[in-house]
Amino acid sequence: MQNTSCTEDRIQHALERCLHGLSGSTDISSNWTAGLCLNYWSLEELVNRDATNYIILAEKTLARTREAQKNGEYELLTPLALMFYFAVLRAPYIPETSDLLPKAFEVFHTFLTWPAPYCHVYQEMLSFISEEQKAPGITYQRLVRTEQGIPTRSSCSSTATVLLVNPAELPSEFLSVAEQLSNAEQPIQQTLVSLIQHLFQASLGTHAHTEELGASLKSRPIEKLQEIYSDLTEAMEHATMADIKPGKKRESLKAKLLEVAEKAGLMQGNTGSSLTSRIQPIFMPVAKCYTYSWDQDDFDILNQILLSESHLESLEDDVTEEDEEVDFEEVDDKDEDGGKSPKQDSVFSNSYVYWNFPSDSKEDPSMSMSNLASHSMTFVSSLSSCVDSGYVEDSDEGSQEISEIGEYQEERANNKLKQKICQLFKTKGHQAKDKLKAELSPCISHPLLSPFPDISKTIPLRRAGSMYTPQLSRIPVRSKRSKSLPQPAFGTQFLDLQLSQKVAFKRRPFLSCDDDTKVSTLRIVVFGSDRISGKVARAYSNLRLKESSCPLLTRFFKLQFYYIPVKRSSSSTNAPMTNAESPLKSPSPSGRFPLQDVFGDEASTNDISHYIGILDPWYKRNIMGLMDLSTSMLCQSSKEENETTETTTMPILADMVLYYCRFATRSLLLQLYRAEITFDSGGKQTEVFIQCLELGHSADLRAIRASGPGCKRLGIDGDQDVIPFTLQIVYSKSTVSGRSRWSNGEKVCTSVSLRKACNTYEELDSKMECLNLTVREVVKRQNSKTKKSFNQICTSHIKIDKAQIIAQHGGTFPLCLDQDERKILQRVIKCEVSPCYKPEDRDFCRRNRRPSWSQASQNQSEFCSLLCLPIATFCGAQP
């Protein structure tokens, strides 16, 4: 038997507790799952106590992976990979003599032949291990650098996390945790010192002398720290790209780091190991977060990120200065050559934050340059009607050019000096706002630009040049006319031209996971029940429509959506809560809350989170499992307030939110459904839902509940007492073969509901995804002695994929989407429900649809792309 220490035994026990119940062979009662979601958080707290614990956890995880592979415990493979990734990511130092990474590479390499998602997960793990062998700690550096928005010479990527909360539905403790995350940003100087300490320690170990290094760095100004960190980052990035053996790469990296340290006067010749030096754990800072109150069917509030994010400055100061120094010389060279050599404007450089031209290897660079040239020539020629004639005699051209070159140099020097002076007295927020006003001119109709109605007037006057038009060469100096002549003005013709040329810029596809051209990532974290998930679905659909006509958010950001289920607070519904101390309580295995009225209708459900949890057990354990804990436990910190630590201690909920955002990298696509609604007035409206659509009495009940205390005087009748109505229900049932069978009939009923079928694993097949049609039919209506009618109800359940519901005999019915009291539509006479397709493909589908609605093309999904909501998960879709 192998001798182990007490710490190793505790880590092994904590690891087994994290994996307990994830295997399909283990059956856990729902009554005993309350504390399972805290197992991983407890493991992190245990490992963070000492720097050597990370390597112990990595070794234990690797051994458990071999055992899971041998025993066929496939459900454990992705959680084990995530825990190994965490251990190596947070390890302050892995000795060169350690065989941990080579062994892991050998073990993980066998999973490349496995089906998805295992092959994708371990392919990323192999890339991660390979980079860590070449440049230790580079993944940690990239993660923290992007979360804090720290630019370098080689990279200016950033990641912003947005927390969308609804104060009417969330407990006050949750709101305080969200505010705590937003206010946890630490000073940039402290972050740079921590990153430099981690960088040296990951490569040099005890030779880095972390404490002395930190004391030396704290006395340096921020500008000097940024310069040092940029040099160190370039050395690490170069080490990952150099084509030499990993061992030699690490030695070369050490030499480069020591060279930078000696140049900056950090080590001062003290690079040896001492008895007092030891590996210090480097705590990861809290990601930069923004908290907004949100309860709308759109994401317009996200446009505020464009104004608040500091990384939206055009370029770093050092890069801008280098470009400005060589710009005029290059312009003169181009003018002497007659403008034949293409010159790209500095705004469109590859390192610029906003714009990314197609640079993939698949695209022809000559074609892209020719397109840019044609656009530039078109733009210049189109401005001919707006530019003054500027007649100049040929005899004066030479002398005028020489004199104007000198004037141009003098103006450039003066403008540069003015810009430097202005930057000294301007805050970052003012700089970002000014640049945003000048650079976002094409999207005048976008809601973000409503505070700037005269934005076109703020565009600086410039000859034949624009922030939005690729420019191959500057107009010759002689085109600069006399100052007495009228100056050109950019009118509607300029704006129309820019809108027509937006296809020249590369924009990230919505559901693409392979295109990494965006330098900025926007994490969108939403909290709530199925009602909030429905709002996210409608907001996502509206976002696609807006961005397809005038891209703004998707032009700058790669969007990632995160969903944390929370039960609706008692203040948002009229019914009391089940447990006053557990607003997230959900003991039922189906994810539905036991809160029901006397007629059996759920006031709030969490079916979407249950759907995700079935496909991703690690999400179910660590994110959905939070609903089993009380608010007081979720909002408490791991340490008391009077204890001093290097970083701010965060509540358990905050730690798990950050863990979810950092480690959930694979998207799960949730099908959206479209409801085409016709009113009795003849008007039509199209809505989107994701979980349920209710018609009739159940929709009326939600409207009555939403009235608050007034619902008592309105009175609530059950299905047995209400007046029924007649509906014509036409629905399609899909089979395994892909054929559809249509049924048509009239029903006298009180309520009809369409719910996403997501309660069992068999219902999650993408080819068989369907809706549950529930009809409460009145089979007999009796009159009692009190002259009050009494309905005998028969409830039927049918699995469908499309449906059409039409009111008969001149009647109407109410309709409610995703349990949202604000989305109750009255006086509806017809409702068509079908899967939602992408806007660009819907017209094609309608053109190819047969005249009869019930005889739609059976292979429609083969020609039209379905519109799905991407939710970030740990494992992704299971095979």
UniProtKB/Swiss-Prot annotation:
Activity: how regulated: Greatly activated by G gamma proteins.
Q: Where mainly found?
A: nucleus
Q: Where is the composition biased (Polar residues)?
A: 570-589
Q: How does it sit in the membrane?
A: Peripheral membrane protein
Where are the stretches annotated Interaction with beta-gamma G protein dimers?
A: 651-751
**Entry keyword set:** Cell membrane, Cytoplasm, Membrane, Nucleus
Under what name is this protein listed? Phosphoinositide 3-kinase regulatory subunit 5
Q: What is the originating organism of this protein? A: Xenopus laevis
